[in-house]
Amino acid sequence: MLGILAKLFGTKSGRDIKKLQPLVERINEEFQKLHALDDNQLRAQTDKIKGIIDADLSGIDKQIKEHHDKIAANPDLSIDEKEVVFQAIDKLELERNKELEKVLEKVLPQAFAVVKDTARRWKENGKLTVTATPMDIELASRKKNVQIIGSTAEWSSKWLAAGTEVTWEMQHFDVQLIGGMVLHHGKISEMGTGEGKTLVATLPAYLNALARRGVHVVTVNDYLAKRDSEWMAPLFEFHGISVDCIDKYQPNSEERRKAYRADITYGTNNEFGFDYLRDNMATDKDDLVQRGHHYAMVDEVDSVLIDDARTPLIISGPVPKGDQHEFAELKPRIQRVLEEQKKLINTYLVEAKRYIAAGKEKEAGLELLRAHRGYPGYKPLIKQLSETGIKSILQKTENEYMAENNKRMPEVDLPLYFVIDEKHNQVDFTEKGVDFITGEQEDPTLFVLPDIGSELAKIEKDKSISDQERMEQTEKLLSDYSIKQERIHTLQQLLKAYTLFEKDTDYVIMDGKVKIVDEQTGRIMDGRRYSDGLHQALEAKENVRVEEATQTYATITLQNYFRMYHKLSGMTGTAETEEAEFQQIYNLDVVVVPTNRSIARLDEQDKVYKTTREKYNAVADEIVELTEKGRPVLVGTTSVDISELLSRMLKMRNIKHQVLNAKLHAKEADVVAEAGKPGTVTIATNMAGRGTDIKLTAEAKASGGLAIIGTERHESRRVDRQLRGRAGRQGDPGSSQFFVSLEDNLMRLFGSDRIAKFMDRMGYKEGEVIQHSMISNSIERAQKKVEENNFGQRKRLLEYDNVMNSQRVVIYKRRKNALYGERLKLDILNMIFDLCEDMVFGAYTTKNYDNFKLRSISVFGVIPDITEEVFNKATAETLVKSFYEEVLAHYEQKIKFVKEKTQPTFNELQLTRGETIENIVIPFTDGKRNINIIAPLKELAQSDSRALEQAIERYITLAVIDMHWKDHLREMDELKQSVQNAAYEQKDPLLVYKFEGFELFKKFVYTVNADIVSFLFKADIPKQDTVPVRELKQQPVQQPKYRETKDEAGSAFGGGNANQQVEEAVAPPKAEPLRSQKIANRNDKVSVQYMDGSVKRDIKYKAVEDDLLSNKCVLIEE
């Protein structure tokens, strides 16, 4: 039915492309006109187009400038007058963006034609020759492709990109012009792999760069960001448009700041997001790196906005006692319970076999279900389930016990120590497990949380104890609860680390560290860490040093980060399957752009085997057959472990091959360069998926092109399509074939029920293969189930973050106002007014004058002139106005007093050392806390300057916001965890979170306002004989000791997504143990490192043998 409608009315994408066709013709007309121009005249077109843009926007730009000038010239405007002006500026900025899009649409044909003709000239002529400009001369000093010959500059068509020399041989096709327009219009362009998406991006990047508001080109990894920026840069630089890449430079560096000032900035999604968070932790506007969020173009948009959207960006820092933990102490208990559970599972498997042999399917089913609940990934269990009929027995039993909302499942779990739910990535202790890990001589409640509510009520009602005893008992109860909560959490994370995370699949051990492998890209997420104690648990599990715990300082989801842009667009080869999500979350349309040449790749139906052993043998046989034909082969695997297994199998068969995985990423460029040669076998994880362009030699094309072999279906159809897309690029020949077994994760969890029954019914024996469209469709349905599950998680994550986002917008706007200063005075006046209003109305209804007076003294340090008589008779509005004017007058007098007190010192410093001192540090205190104020000496010395007042207000506002914001984030994190229990009360946790979160935020805003205002009113220079100011000496730039993190939101399977954070350390690297591989004799001298980082050197092995066996330390080589 849908096919008939599509034939009658056409597809949405088809209709979109039809609308763009007239524009393609106009671009090509302009392109033909440019042929008659010389290279200098072609270059002059850029300034001509800029002139058109400036002329169309000159009127609105003039109005904006007039409003800013009004604020600068009239610092004493009232609150209401300032508010009106700032609202007018904001409105004009929005209007300017609309007008800008109109003028860009007007000049689009000329702009696209300029880029296309520049590409043509390089391709056909090999060089461009123009009159040298200052930018040409500067570029020639650092780039070999630009040479200055006399007064001319010669731009060669050869240059370096990612260390490899490239020769420009590309020119934009019509379909690429269409792709460029789709991107410019703020939509997603789906273009087949090999269709030149990197080249397509040059068209809208050039056009939008002419607006001089910044263009951000976002990629999935730093290799692509650096490569693409260097590859495409000359196309822009020839026209005077600057290009840079943020991933080439350190965070917070001057070089990165300059990269953002470039007209076009390339970088990875994570770094763009983290720079935004870092900017919102800066204390000086000169420390900011980003300049706004105007236009973002996201390469591999589905990977960035969908796959990575499950991972909120988080900056975290140290917490008090963060190095104190019980991982090493509790680890042996987890190891013991794991061993006991495995013994139990083995018993169940033996019993199941016995029952099956006796024809007792019901009893066998219960034993199998217990084994499956206790350890679903246990290899002997998986092996047994692959036998004919066994899987269906398990499923039948599971359905029976899951009936009526898992009513009978407790019967199954009763004898187990813990239960694993693979589909939801959860593991929980049973009562038997808790009893087991509690020693016989220990308190039975060691791992049991007390009922805090009822216990507190008991203490409160106990009339036999004094108030002092009541307070002591309450403190002891709360302390006991906190300790037990942390201990239980540590145990839970250790259990997760041992049962849900697999070495060489979810993480690898390199350089004495646990390094996470990104399941989507197969790359090491270098320096990133899981948070919430999970990474520490993995470190304890793998016997490497356990790092310190952290707390959140700043956070944002990628969804909310990218939604800040005025215009957002993206490109990928695989977006259509997620079209609904793009529309719903980002309001982005997907347009499928036709290929330039038809795809010649042959995509075979999946080959399905019963066991992984059969599957890998079949893969090896297929590789042998393909290499004998002289075809290059790319073997895609889902983990480092599988890539190494296949490598060993091929070595045994004497097949020469190369491996690309997270451990061997340094060889990536060399491996990719070789992968297109005849007979070359490349085994790769998902690293060889997105963005990898394998160039085929003529011999390879003649032998049938690149053969893709997938060793397992990924949970996402898009990752499979990306792997297939490495072959058949630009009309090249090629083929793809996936090999699947019923033991694969995807099949085991979601897809193998019907296939297993079908294979059993048809009598398939071990080693036989099934290949049918029905099977491929069944696998695709399984993938859809996972994708739907993941979409639900992402949407839920976004709904939670929307609560935080509305709060973040308010706070970051206030921080920005404080940094830039222009709107800060208005914010402070509003704070003072709100506090005056709150104090008056809070006491007015009850006529409690004493309360009003006490709060005034407490916050403002002011005894109000308003008498009790006036307070009781006047209206509340009159009292607010009168009180506000009085308080404001006191504040102005306070600032004047501080200035008079410090002015002589400033004048003397300027007179004696003004030539050498630029900024000075002035200490301020409110009697409790000290804050250093930094201000320029030259401005402070001017008697009519407001520099001191502005510096005091800025630094105090920033310090107070930052101090309370991190505490508020912790409270919101704790709230998010606690509201999940609302589900047991038949309440929606999200609604509870929204309500409670709003109440927390109101409390937070009041606290911040009161703290800022109180500090401003009470702040003074510490009492000394002289004003204690000092010169601000330039310190070398140091990396801040915090981590950037990504909070994994969980896929349907795979430990690497188990609802945890992933952290990126930016603190200085610490010495790590180089773990020794040798086995020592008992009297040998050895060196060991303990879990706390301490080292014992040249000590006899037998002296530390017990510690080594109990995993308290590791052998190291020095």
UniProtKB/Swiss-Prot annotation:
Predominant location: membrane
GO BP: any one term: protein import
InterPro entries (UniProt xref): Helicase_ATP-bd, Helicase_C-like, P-loop_NTPase, SecA, SecA_CS, SecA_DEAD, SecA_motor_DEAD, SecA_preprotein_X-link_dom
Pfam family, one: SecA_SW
Membrane topology value: Peripheral membrane protein
Chain residues that bind ATP: Q176, G194, E195, G196, K197, T198, D693
One CC-aspect GO term: cell envelope Sec protein transport complex
Start and end residues of each stretch annotated as Disordered: 1034-1056
Protein localization: Cell inner membrane; Cytoplasm
Function according to Swiss-Prot or TrEMBL: Part of the Sec protein translocase complex. Interacts with the SecYEG preprotein conducting channel. Has a central role in coupling the hydrolysis of ATP to the transfer of proteins into and across the cell membrane, serving as an ATP-driven molecular motor driving the stepwise translocation of polypeptide chains across the membrane.
Subunit architecture: Monomer and homodimer. Part of the essential Sec protein translocation apparatus which comprises SecA, SecYEG and auxiliary proteins SecDF. Other proteins may also be involved.
Domain of life of the source: Bacteria
Organism of this sequence: Cytophaga hutchinsonii (strain ATCC 33406 / DSM 1761 / CIP 103989 / NBRC 15051 / NCIMB 9469 / D465)
Enzyme class, first EC level, given as a word: translocase
Keyword tags: ATP-binding, Cell inner membrane, Cell membrane, Cytoplasm, Membrane, Nucleotide-binding, Protein transport, Translocase, Translocation, Transport
EC numbers for this chain: 7.4.2.8
SMART domains noted in UniProt: SecA_DEAD, SecA_PP_bind
Name this protein carries in UniProt: Protein translocase subunit SecA
Record field: catalytic activity: ATP + H2O + cellular proteinSide 1 = ADP + phosphate + cellular proteinSide 2
Similarity-based family: Belongs to the SecA family.
GO molecular function terms attached to this record: ATP binding; protein-exporting ATPase activity
